[in-house]
From Swiss-Prot:
Short name of any one Pfam family annotated for the protein: Ubie_methyltran
The UniProt record lists the keyword Coiled coil: no
GO molecular function: 2-methoxy-6-polyprenyl-1,4-benzoquinol methyltransferase activity; demethylmenaquinone methyltransferase activity
Keywords from the named record: Menaquinone biosynthesis, Methyltransferase, S-adenosyl-L-methionine, Transferase, Ubiquinone biosynthesis
Enzyme class, broadest EC rank: transferase
Keyword Nucleotide-binding included in the entry's annotation: no
PROSITE patterns referenced in this protein's UniProt entry, alphabetically: SAM_MT_UBIE, UBIE_1, UBIE_2
EC numbers: 2.1.1.163, 2.1.1.201
Protein name: Ubiquinone/menaquinone biosynthesis C-methyltransferase UbiE
An annotated GO BP: menaquinone biosynthetic process
Family: Belongs to the class I-like SAM-binding methyltransferase superfamily. MenG/UbiE family.
Lineage: Bacteria, Pseudomonadati, Pseudomonadota, Betaproteobacteria, Burkholderiales
Reactions accelerated catalytically: a 2-demethylmenaquinol + S-adenosyl-L-methionine = a menaquinol + S-adenosyl-L-homocysteine + H(+); a 2-methoxy-6-(all-trans-polyprenyl)benzene-1,4-diol + S-adenosyl-L-methionine = a 5-methoxy-2-methyl-3-(all-trans-polyprenyl)benzene-1,4-diol + S-adenosyl-L-homocysteine + H(+)
InterPro entries linked to this entry: SAM-dependent_MTases_sf, UbiE/COQ5_MeTrFase, UbiE/COQ5_MeTrFase_CS
Length: 243
C-alpha cells in the first residue's frame, strides 16, 4: 500500500480523503470567520487578485474546484452573466452546503456539485477556466487532479491554483511561530478545534514550493506556467494554459 502525508503524519493513501473530510466537516461553519482572523483579511485581497487575473468574460464556462464558501464562484457568476456557466464544486458536503446557502443569500444562482478533483465529472475541453483556491494541498494525488483540470479546459483555457506556498526566507521563523502556535490557539478559541488548524499549518509545510508546483503543472501538459507571489510568498497564484 502507498503512503502519503496528512499534515506531518504518514497515512495510507486510502485514508487521507476521509481524514481531510473530517477536518472540513469540523471547520465549515466557522470557515469564513477563521479565514478573516487567520489572514487578517488578506485572503480577500488574494482572491481579488485571482479574479482579476482570471478575466472571466460574458458567456464563458468556469469550474471552481474545492470552492468552499463560494467567494470565487460568486464573482465569476456575475462576470460570466446569464449566458455563462459557473459551477461551484467541492468534495465536502458540509463546505458545499455552506457555499450554496451563502450564494443564494447573496442572490447568486449557479449550479453546485459534489466533485472529486481527481475524477472531474465533465467532458474534455468543456471549460474556459478551472480554479482551485486553497484546495490542492489537501488532495491525495495532486498530479492526477491537475491532469484532470487540464483535461476539462478548452484549448486556450487556463488552470489557476491559488495556494499557500513558501514564504520568503527572512520571515520563516516568524511564520513558523504564527503557524504552529497562533493558528491552533485561534482554532481552539474561535472554532473549538485546535487539531484542524494544526493540520492546516502542517499541510502548508508539506505542499510543494513555487518552483516544484510549476514543474508539476508542466508535467501534466500545462504550458506557459507562471506564478505570482503574494504577501511575501505566504500565498502564490499559479497559472497554466492549454494549447
Amino acid at each position: 500500500m502507498s503512503e502519503t502525508h496528512f499534515g506531518f503524519e504518514k497515512v495510507d493513501e486510502s485514508e487521507k480523503a476521509g481524514k481531510v473530510a473530517g477536518v472540513f466537516h469540523s471547520v465549515a461553519s466557522k470557515y469564513d470567520v477563521m479565514n478573516d482572523l487567520m489572514s487578517g483579511g488578506m485572503h480577500r485581497l488574494w482572491k481579488v487578485f485571482t479574479i482579476a487575473q482570471a478575466n472571466v468574460r460574458p458567456g464563458q464556462k468556469v469550474l471552481d474546484i474545492a470552492g468552499g464558501t463560494g467567494d470565487l464562484a460568486k464573482a465569476f457568476a456575475k462576470q460570466a452573466g446569464p449566458t455563462g456557466e459557473v459551477w461551484l464544486t467541492d468534495i465536502n458536503e458540509s463546505m458545499l452546503r455552506v457555499g450554496r446557502d451563502r450564494l443564494l443569500n447573496k442572490g447568486v444562482v449557479t449550479p453546485v456539485a459534489l466533485c472529486d478533483a481527481e475524477r472531474i465529472p465533465f467532458p474534455d475541453n468543456y471549460f474556459d477556466l478551472v480554479t482551485v483556491a486553497f484546495g490542492l494541498r489537501n488532495m491525495t494525488h495532486k498530479d492526477a487532479a491537475l491532469a484532470e483540470m487540464r483535461r476539462v479546459i478548452k484549448p486556450g483555457g487556463k488552470v489557476m491554483v491559488l495556494e499557500f506556498s513558501k514564504v520568503w526566507k527572512p520571515l520563516e521563523k516568524f511564520y513558523d511561530v504564527y503557524s504552529f502556535k497562533v493558528l491552533p490557539w485561534l482554532g481552539e478559541r474561535v472554532a473549538g478545534d485546535a487539531p484542524s488548524y494544526r493540520y492546516l499549518a502542517e499541510s502548508i509545510r508539506m505542499h510543494p514550493d513555487q518552483g516544484s508546483l510549476v514543474r508539476m503543472m508542466e508535467q501534466v501538459g500545462l504550458e506557459q506556467v507562471e506564478y505570482f507571489n503574494l504577501t511575501a510568498g505566504v500565498v502564490a497564484l499559479h497559472v497554466g494554459r492549454k494549447y
